[in-house]
Amino acid sequence: MAKETKRTAPNMDEIIANAKKEGKLKAAPLDWNEVYYTNCPLISASNVDQELGWTKEEYKKIGVQYRYLRDNKENDWYPHYIHNLDNIIRFGGLFPPIHVHADIRRTVLLGVTHVAKEGGVMMVRSRDDIYRMEDLKGKKIGLSRSQNKIKTDWWGIQEEQGIEMMLRMNGMTRDDVEIVEFPYPDDWYDNPEMMGPEMENPSELWLKRDHKNDLAFRPLETALGNGVIDAMYSQSRVLSVLSETTGKFKSIEDLARYPDWTLQVANIPAAITCTVEMAEKHPELAVTFLKGMIKVGRWANEHKQAAAAILDKQTFYRDVEDTFEGIRRVDLVPNLSPQNLVSVDIGKDFMLSHGYIKNDFDVNEWAAPQFLEQAARELLELEWKKRTHAKLPQTADPLSSGGRVG
């Protein structure tokens, strides 16, 4: 436990170089005949596809092997956070890819999925005489602090961002409360105990781990329960419900209740990113991934109950029904809408202003909609050919011609 410290963005070139000298950041040799994927345990088409396998089928059509990051024992967990594999595609929380693109290496933003009304909540002990944010004046609010300099402190970023937003929405500032930091090693990413055996599917990670009740994903709950702090930020309604189920905690503020959508940016929207090397040298690999995501996303949108049963294996909703309620209004087809790009920009600006990244960049230049557009076009052309094949002597191809249809 420590008092709040002011951050300065680290020199990532130096940190990465030192990590390599120490024998860290081991990764498989580059082979463009295989693509690795990695994702976070959140709402995404990729997490649904773990059970469908449709993206793997798309890659088989072009003779490329599609593998989960940890399906190869040569890879540790760091590529999920710092993209140190040229041939990896990541679908996960927003803050790590922002950090990578700003300070480590150039990447391409291929698409996002946003879960609206998930800005986070403020939690206190259920029997404390605290019912409003104003009651926290002079009280202690916890803040996680990763000591791992190789990757970004995404837990701490979302907590700090959420705390500041809640204070502001209640006419308060950081001066009204005491922010207490909780440093932790955060050094498991190449730990031998976390490295084996290899996993073909990300959901295998949870076969021996009860993630819905694992306090590693609610890092400040113990400190709050023991009275070391008076309040903690919880990333979303999802995690707060798990805390409330214990009967020990309650929520006194929820950013989801406000009409302002710019408050709903707790490490979201989830972002799809690839390296610029993949995008420029092998664009078909990025397009193929997005074809899979579009197909799976459309299926999930049409079969929300089935998608909920799959996602419940990996996400932090209480059960399948709770998962269904969480995804009922979510569009699982990735997009790069203007509104979602603004949400990305909000996250980036917070990281820059608070010393989590050193370099600024233009989110609209980071986004590359041509890959999503090409994937959608290829799927549409294929569907058109399927539907017209039985009705026309020669399959029409309207999308590639300049002629008018109708």
Give the residues covered by each predicted segment.
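Extracytoplasmic/secreted proteins, especially bacterial periplasmic and envelope-associated proteins
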Residues: 50, 54, 95, 99, ...
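Secondary-structure end/capping motifs
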Residues: 279-358
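Conserved C-terminal helix/tail region of periplasmic/extracytoplasmic solute-binding proteins
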Residues: 2-14, 352-406
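Short, solvent-exposed loop/beta-turn-alpha elements that line the ligand-binding surface or hinge
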Residues: 56-61, 258-262, 332-339
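Short, surface-exposed acidic
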Residues: 61-69, 172-179, 284, 315-328, ...
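Short, glycine-/small- and polar/acidic-enriched structural segments
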Residues: 4-192, 236, 394-406
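Pocket-lining segment of extracytoplasmic ligand-binding domains
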Residues: 188-310
